[in-house]
From Swiss-Prot:
Binding annotation for UDP-N-acetyl-alpha-D-glucosamine: 11-14, 25, 80, 85-86, 107-109, 144, 159, 233, 339, 357, 372, 383
EC number(s) given by UniProt: 2.7.7.23, 2.3.1.157
Subunit structure: Homotrimer.
Protein name per the record: Bifunctional protein GlmU
Region Linker, residue ranges: 236-256
The keyword Isomerase belongs to this UniProt entry's keyword annotation: no
Reactions catalysed, as given in the entry: alpha-D-glucosamine 1-phosphate + acetyl-CoA = N-acetyl-alpha-D-glucosamine 1-phosphate + CoA + H(+); N-acetyl-alpha-D-glucosamine 1-phosphate + UTP + H(+) = UDP-N-acetyl-alpha-D-glucosamine + diphosphate
Start and end residues of each stretch annotated as N-acetyltransferase: 257-462
Family annotation (PANTHER family): BIFUNCTIONAL PROTEIN GLMU, NUCLEOTIDYL TRANSFERASE
Length: 462
């Protein structure tokens, strides 16, 4: 459902000085996605008619990295030339929003507020002039405090740096900075803001006191989980938030039947779907979209990215797999690298220290030791000996290799592409193949072994 008179403003212009980084804070990734992208994805489900993102520090980088073409709701980028505070940032957007429109204000470094929480906040707005998201924290350090009068009404927000007495320090209810108000009201309140001397900035939070003193009603609500309002101001904050995100994802996967042997040593940087009786050992990283069939086993320290794995596959430790499809009952690893465009058909076997790129390996085919295969179509029941190399690059272009069914390739062979090897061919160990080979042939190109009589090896004099 989309509301015609309801827009969102996301503030993402700050430098993030405490991050001590050249990368804009909102472009740090959690779970394989930029923090700002997480937030936009959530807001898209709230029902707003448009989203305005205020950018400033390295805004061009932010616009380039954030994918907005995937959304049906328009996302507009608004530049804040001078970084003079959150109050000024919102003022930059309001000329583009009609006076009677409701405005949801959020922060790009608070990425995990849920759409359900925001929908509840929108419902509360129908009962008041400002609906605010607050939280009660055992340790509110760093957050602005909610000040209430004796009747319990919100009268102001005191920023952490402006706390001056013990009573204010004891306040546990904090401001998340997230609220909804009418555009015309915001314009009036913001027009009366003055800068804070300590930072020479306009604080958006000051509008709460202005609104209260003008007789406007302010209601609050808390999220179900304080994880939703966790923000990032430093590298330490980022690590804490990422850890909590991973813990929640792991619990969901465990609840769905996935066996993760050590939840503290598993990293999900995308999405994972899985079948039954799947086992994941320690230090496994999942990136992009990964699909695991039934009874899949993944050994320690593997990385899987954008990969589809069929039933009963075993992936042994230290294998790195990207954009690959692995067939039924195949075995991979240890120490294997499968690069984009690789397809392993059922019951194939790729072993120690093998690299494969843009290659189809047929059913029951094996390449078990120390090989590189690139840009190849390899048939069924092919045995590729240890140390075999497909020479697919001539310095300018990549070339294809085609290998038929039932081929045996001896150890330490080189296949110089472009080349076609027919069915049932046998290639002797140490052979360099430079021309096409017809079906059923046996070839060898190495020199014959011979002895040199009476030859003495030179030795160093001691």
């Amino acid at each position: 459902m989309s509301y015609i008179n309801f827009s969102a403003i996301i503030l993402a212009a700050g430098r993030g000085n405490r991050m001590l980084s050249d990368t804009p804070k909102v472009l740090y990734q959690i779970g394989g996605k930029f923090m700002l992208q997480h937030l936009i994805d959530s807001v898209m489900q709230v029902g707003v008619s448009s989203i305005y993102v205020v950018h400033g520090y390295k805004g061009e980088m932010i616009i380039k990295e954030i994918n907005t073409n995937q959304y049906k709701i328009p996302v507009y980028w608004i530049l804040q030339h001078d970084l003079t505070g959150t109050g000024d940032a919102v003022q930059r957007v309001l000329p583009f929003i009609s006076d009677d429109e409701e405005v949801l204000v959020l922060y790009g470094d608070v990425p995990f507020v849920s759409y359900k929480t925001l929908q509840r906040l929108h419902v509360i707005k129908s009962q008041c002039d400002i609906s605010m998201l607050t939280a009660t924290l055992p340790n509110p350090k760093g957050y602005g405090r909610i000040v209430r009068n004796q009747e319990g009404s919100v009268v102001s927000i005191i920023e952490h740096d402006d706390i001056i007495n013990d009573d204010q320090k004891k306040i546990k209810e904090v401001s998340t900075g997230i609220f909804i108000a009418i555009s015309n009201h915001l314009k009036c309140w913001l027009s009366t803001l003055t800068t804070h001397k300590s930072k020479n900035e306009f604080y958006l939070t000051d509008i709460i006191q202005i609104a209260h003193q003008s007789g406007y009603s302010i209601h609050t609500m808390c999220p179900d989980d304080t994880f939703e309002i966790m923000g990032v101001n430093s590298k330490s904050d980022f690590v804490d938030l990422d850890k909590q995100y991973q813990q929640r994802k792991v619990q969901c996967l465990l609840s769905s039947g996935l066996m993760i042997i050590d939840p503290n040593r598993f990293d999900l940087r995308g999405t994972l779907v899985h079948g039954k009786d799947v086992y994941i050992d320690i230090n496994v990283i999942i990136e992009g979209h990964v699909s695991l069939g039934n009874r899949v086993k993944i050994g320690a320290s593997c990385i899987l990215k954008d990969t589809i794995v069929a039933d009963d596959v075993e992936i042994y430790p230290f294998s790195i797999i990207e954009n690959t499809t692995i067939g039924f009952q195949s075995k991979v690893g240890p120490f294997v690298r499968l690069r984009p465009g690789t397809e392993l058909k059922e019951k194939s076997h790729v072993g120690n220290f093998v690299e494969i790129k843009n290659t189809r390996l047929g059913e029951q085919s094996k390449v078990k030791h120390l090989s590189y295969l690139g840009d190849a179509e390899i048939g069924n029941q092919v045995n590729i000996g240890a140390g075999t190399i497909i020479c697919n690059y001539d310095g300018m272009m990549k070339h294809q290799t085609i290998i038929g069914d039932d081929v045996f390739i001896g150890a330490d062979s080189q296949l110089v592409a472009p080349i076609t090897i027919g069915k049932n061919v046998t290639i002797g160990a140490g052979t360099t193949v430079t021309r096409d080979v017809a079906a059923n042939e046996t070839i060898i190109s190495r020199i014959r072994q011979f002895s040199i009589l009476n030859w003495k090896r030179l030795k160093n004099k001691k």
